[in-house]
From Swiss-Prot:
Cystine pairs: none
Alphabetical keyword list: NADP, Oxidoreductase, Stress response
Name of the molecule in the record: Probable aryl-alcohol dehydrogenase AAD4
Induction comment: By oxidative stress.
């Protein structure tokens, strides 16, 4: 997304709040800890802590830049020590007494589900954390963790964060059904394809100005698939009377499931306004079907064999339909 100085960051946060925004997502390691520090300074200077929902994360190595690679085992991972020091430091940087949502940033496979959920629950009991989230973790791990938590009077995960967009739909295979089962909200990242979803007009403008794509992986060209999906997004955008491809990309994930809160970022207030525009756009079933036809997605076995949940599809699976006539209306 490019760099910003503190003044520019505060201006963007001010515009976000004035537009009605109140939830900010960050992590212990973002920008070598500066993200949490700046957010904390902004909230304090504006006296807005009570109005803001802060979501941050632990697991990532947030001290590598300071202590050096290979020397920061206690500052990363899902284990108790990592959790303890990370939350301690996040509270200090954010200049707050509590974290609204604390995420496990990613599953490291080195700490047991029981240890992680027990340790997280203690933070909730202490009032340091209000709700728990989990990010970039297999659905089976989250399911086992939530079953353990609810079976033992612990706090379960209430929101899942992961990669999902109209071009990359693996999220729909197991994550969405899992979240539906546990009543979890969804916070997808990479909704706009890491900045690669750009209309032909926007790309020509960039070329004219000597700019490439400014993405998380550097400046580069669109792939053939990204060009195709961008053209499709532009077509749907035109049907909604807008030129914003990103607004349609955001509207797509919001139209696919309940309780979807896309994570979006940007450096300019005009980008923020385009993102907000997506909140008023509701895609039709035909538009969703069209977008998904551009780059077909195979949900894989067993769903492509037994079908999805009839409560969602409103129709019986192939095997059930062979045996009985059932209405799901």
């Amino acid at each position: 997304m490019g760099s910003m100085n503190k003044e520019q960051a505060f201006e963007l946060l001010d515009a976000f709040y004035e537009a009605g925004g109140n939830c900010i997502d960050t992590a212990n390691s973002y920008q070598n800890e500066e993200s949490e520090i700046w957010i904390g300074e902004w909230m304090k200077s504006r006296k807005l802590r009570d109005q803001i929902v802060i979501a941050t994360k632990f697991t990532g190595d947030y001290k590598k830049y300071e202590v050096g690679g290979g020397k920061s085992a206690n500052y990363c991972g899902n284990h108790k020590h990592s959790l303890h020091v990370s939350v301690r430091d996040s509270l200090r940087k954010l200049q707050t007494d509590w974290i609204d949502i604390l995420y496990v940033h990613w599953w490291d496979y080195m700490s047991s589900i029981e240890e992680v959920m027990d340790s997280l629950h203690i933070l909730v009991q202490q009032g340091k954390v209000l709700y728990l989230g989990v990010s970039d973790t297999p659905a089976w791990v989250v399911s086992a963790a939530n079953y353990y938590a609810t079976s033992h009077g612990k706090t379960p995960f209430s929101i899942y964060q992961g990669k999902w967009n109209v071009l990359n739909r693996d999220f729909e295979r197991d994550i969405i059904p899992m979240a539906r089962h546990f009543g979890m909200a969804l916070a997808p990242w990479d909704v706009m394809g890491g900045g690669r979803f750009q209309s032909k007009k926007a790309m020509e403008e960039r070329k004219k100005n000597g700019e490439g794509l400014r993405t998380v992986s550097g400046t580069s060209k669109q792939t053939d698939k990204e060009v195709k999906i961008s053209e499709a997004l532009a077509k749907v955008a035109e049907e909604h009377g807008t030129e914003s491809v990103t607004a349609i990309a955001i509207a797509y994930v919001r139209s696919k499931a309940k309780n979807v809160f896309p994570l979006v970022g940007g450096r300019k207030i005009e980008h923020l306004k385009q993102n907000i525009e997506a909140l008023s756009i509701k895609l039709t079933p035909e538009q969703i079907e069209y977008l998904e036809s551009i780059i077909p997605f195979d949900v894989g076995f067993p769903t492509n064999f037994i079908g999805d949940d009839p409560a969602v599809t409103k129709k019986a699976s192939l095997l059930t339909a062979m045996s009985a006539q059932i209405s799901f209306d």
